[in-house]
Amino acid sequence: MNPYDAKDRRWILSMFFFVVLFCNNVSTSSSSSEVITIKPRHLSLLKSALQRSSGEQSDLWRPLTDQGWSPCIDLGNSPSLPDKTAGYVQVFLDGGLNQQRMGICDAVAVAKILNATLVIPYLEVNPVWQDSSSFVDIFDVDHFIDSLKDDIRVVRELPDEYSWSTREYYGTAVRETRVKTAPVHASANWYIENVSPVLQSYGIAAISPFSHRLSFDHLPAEIQRLRCKVNFQALRFVPHITSLGDALVSRLRNPSWRSNKEQKNVDHLGDMTNPHRRQEPGKFAVLHLRFDKDMAAHSACDFGGGKAEKLSLAKYRQMIWQGRVLNSQFTDEELRSQGRCPLTPEEMGLLLAAFGFDNNTRLYLASHKVYGGEARISTLRQVFPRMEDKRSLASSEERARIKGKASLLAALDYYVSMHSDIFISASPGNMHNALVGHRTFENLKTIRPNMALIGQLFLNKSITWVDFQQALGEGHVNRQGQIRLRKPKQSIYTYPAPDCMCHV
């Protein structure tokens, strides 16, 4: 039964318009010099969304049917590893967690191609995320090494004779053992022709930069499957991430968790994950909302914050990219009609409501720092009052080990996302791509927004709620997790079929 009757909905609606008026006089700022007003941009649609009837579509939460594809990464009777390898391969990975994740998979593949021993990859500190977490802080290194013991040799650290080969060593001068010319999406032959000689001469090769440095095409089937084995089996988060993730999933599925917590003040991680206390598990969806300042600035789109916001984002764009942003040459209307603008929290709320999610939906918000803060999120929260995130679900004690660590926070969001009934992302990106591929591999429902269609619908300021719902529904019939075969140049990490899945 919907706890919000007609009287309650009228009260919520009246409070919403009070907030709108209030927001006109309240500013958010990412620095003391910025004064940016945030207010809803799609008032007509928002009014309809807040007044929508309760009760969701009967097939909304229905799992995907068997599509005739299953995981297929068994490498079969692989030949035993040679007694001696060609040397040691190091890689230095930049980017955020999921870009680094893909780089790790590529590093294993390159080590296999070269018959080399892989040193546990070094994770660079990203200037945006500012997290110094290492591989062993994020991933279960023992599981990683054990999972790959029949495929390649992996070592935690270099032997003493090569201990000089460090990040600092390569940052101070040109070194013969550093390979820095690997092209984007390099072929297997490129590595054999250019890295093998370095291994033969020095016994070690350090490849940097390495992100996106291995082709998705023209590779042996066993190399492709090895990449998927790393991604879907060998890379497992450290126990404290999976334990906390399991606790959050349990709380999302337990509708009485919060009232029980308030009444009994029970221990979060222990009592509330006790299987004997569980009721019939509920369903929940995950919304991945990548709406950070760097993404908003790089998109060059208008997000309704007025002249102050435009100037602020333009200044940030100049500071980070020195004006080298392709989107800057297009108008906001052109960018939106092409689907090149990330969706705001408000727009994602309208999108989910139009798909049929009602205000009883348990929605988990997977995000880092939303540009505009709570003022930007407030509209989404009004449409989905039962929205949660890692901060609302976990105690401060539970969050202590991951506080301020963007990669560990992203790992927790990734884990919860993989255990949700439905996943949807507000914009393309590495986390979106990684989760789409992983959930495809596991045959889990994943809504892939048609960004161009959505952008065009939001440009139509006179569109009715009924027409908005109908257009979205028709435009996403085949975008809910159906298998899509990888095309040339597409990522195996986003499209694991047919390379890593077998058609039964």
Curated annotation (Swiss-Prot):
Give the E.C. number(s): 2.4.1.-
Q: Where exactly are the transmembrane stretches of this chain?
A: 11-27
Query: Can you cite an annotated GO cellular component?
Result: Golgi cis cisterna
| Glycosylation positions in this chain | N115, N359, N460
What are the recorded GO MF terms, alphabetically? glycosyltransferase activity
**Binding positions for substrate per the UniProt entry:** H288, L289, R290
PANTHER family annotated for this entry? Answer: O-FUCOSYLTRANSFERASE 2-RELATED, O-FUCOSYLTRANSFERASE 39
What is the protein named? O-fucosyltransferase 39
